[in-house]
């Protein structure tokens, strides 16, 4: 997904 807390990943994955 395109999240604000990730960019190229989910917010719970790109953290």
From Swiss-Prot:
The organism's place on the tree of life at top rank: Eukaryota
Secreted among keywords: yes
Subcellular location: Secreted, Cell wall
One Gene Ontology CC term in the entry: extracellular region
Broad class of the protein's primary localization: secreted
Entry keywords, A to Z: Cell wall, Secreted
Name of this protein: Dirigent-like protein
Classification of source organism: Eukaryota, Viridiplantae, Streptophyta, Embryophyta, Tracheophyta
